[in-house]
Regions:
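Mobile beta-alpha loop/short-helix "lid" or hinge segments that flank ligand
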Residues: 26-32, 125-127, 141-144
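Alpha-helix N-cap/N′ positions at the starts of helices
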Residues: 36, 59, 81, 145-148
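Residue-level signal for the nucleotide or nucleotide-sugar donor/cofactor binding architecture
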Residues: 13, 141, 159-160
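Conserved amphipathic alpha-helical segments that form helical-bundle/coiled-coil interaction surfaces
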Residues: 52, 73-135, 148-155, 164, ...
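Short linear motifs at protein or domain termini
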Residues: 1-65, 69, 111, 177, ...
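C-terminal peripheral helix-coil segments that are non-catalytic and often amphipathic
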Residues: 152-159, 167, 175-178, 182-188
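Short helix-capping/hinge motifs at transmembrane helix termini and TM-loop junctions
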Residues: 68-69, 114, 138-139
Length: 188
């Protein structure tokens, strides 16, 4: 539960910004308000996950396709370094650090498109994607597949092979959807 008074006290603010934050979370589908009980974090559902990942799949494939044409050598070098950073982070038990490295990897691809409207759309989707990303990254059995997909994405971008990059990005998102769907079903 999201307790207004406790959150306000903990953050040293009045209840007004807490209420506004909860309202924003509700608009994003991340919280629900139950009459006479208050707000709580929304449960992950298969339908929500499918909706979010369907949009992510289309936008990630588009970003990868554009990146094939637009990505600079400097961005490729940064992407390779971030790919290695992600691999190193998987050796820790810090899911937050792993997720940050994964977000950074994808952000480089998004930025390389040179399309601020696409980047903005992906950023707007980020908070909704984050909870599914974290669930996926909690299972270390997914790491070898993720690392191979990141490597294949980088190779495709280096070769400017749109088919390879978009196919790998498609599979990358599909693998996440399958794994998270199984986790949601286990929790029900």
């Amino acid at each position: 539960r999201l307790m207004e008074l406790q959150l306000a006290a903990k953050l040293g603010v009045s209840r007004t910004p807490i209420r506004e934050a909860i309202r924003m979370l509700e608009q994003e589908g991340l919280a629900v308000t139950i009459p006479r009980k208050g707000a709580e974090v929304a449960k992950m559902t298969e339908k929500d996950m499918e909706d979010v990942l369907q949009i992510r799949e289309a936008l990630d494939e588009l970003a990868a396709k554009i990146a094939c044409e637009q990505i600079s050598e400097e961005q490729l070098e940064e992407l390779v370094a971030t790919m290695h950073e992600f691999e190193e982070s998987t050796k820790t038990d810090n899911v937050k650090k792993i997720a940050e490295a994964d977000v950074k990897f994808h952000d480089i691809i998004y930025q390389s498109t040179g399309n601020p409207k696409l980047v903005n759309m992906l950023n707007n989707l980020r908070e909704q994607m984050y909870r599914y990303r974290v669930e996926y990254l909690k299972d270390e059995n997914n790491y070898p597949t993720l690392m191979k997909e990141h490597k294949d994405i980088v190779e495709g971008l280096v070769r400017k092979n749109k088919m390879q990059v978009t196919a790998t990005m498609h599979q990358h998102v599909k693998n996440q959807a399958v794994a998270v769907k199984a986790m949601i079903q286990e929790q029900e």
